[in-house]
């Protein structure tokens, strides 16, 4: 055998031998895909009310901390729009997540399935946006107060804001779960 191009002969590499050794998937792999999907859907069914419950807890804490933030003239939460906004949105978030948690655990359907899924998805997104909006509006005011004097009023305001941010994170995760549920339904 002559080599007209005068090139080295090509040797078989480990990658090529590994590719030859791999076999076609067995018919049983389809069932494992189905069971993986069932496990994923079961995990989402369990995680969604848990994230809403966590949001309920943090929203309630933000509400209670902000309401109790009264420390005399110039140090009352109700003298500042930003803090009143955090209070109002934490009340809305508490009511929304309490209603969603009650609806889930009572197994009652207030709407048909399609409407309920749409309400879950849109409600989670709207309330999550309101939570982060309220927190982001109050952060600059709290930072300005901390530059002048760091006291219990600013600490309470900062803790209420952080609870609102934690509630946002929990509700944003719940919105992801709601979006997944919405995308997997066949009525879309």
Swiss-Prot record:
* GO annotations of cellular component type: plasma membrane
Query: Key word Hydrolase present in the record?
Result: no
What keywords are assigned to this protein?
A: Cell membrane, Membrane, Transmembrane, Transmembrane helix
Chain ranges sitting on the Cytoplasmic side read 1-46, 106-120, 178-188
Spell out the family assignment given in the record's similarity comment: Belongs to the Casparian strip membrane proteins (CASP) family.
Intervals, Extracellular compartment? 68-84, 142-156
State where it is primarily located: membrane
> This protein's superkingdom?
Eukaryota
User: So where does this one cross the membrane?
Assistant: 47-67, 85-105, 121-141, 157-177
Q: Where is the composition biased (Polar residues)?
A: 24-34
Locations listed in the record: Cell membrane
Quaternary assembly: Homodimer and heterodimers.
Locations of Basic and acidic residues compositional bias?
A: 1-11
Region (Disordered) residue spans: 1-34
Official protein name in the record: CASP-like protein 4B1
Protein source organism: Arabidopsis lyrata subsp. lyrata
- An example of a Pfam family matching this protein is CASP_dom
Topology with regard to the membrane? Multi-pass membrane protein
The major lineage groups are: Eukaryota, Viridiplantae, Streptophyta, Embryophyta, Tracheophyta
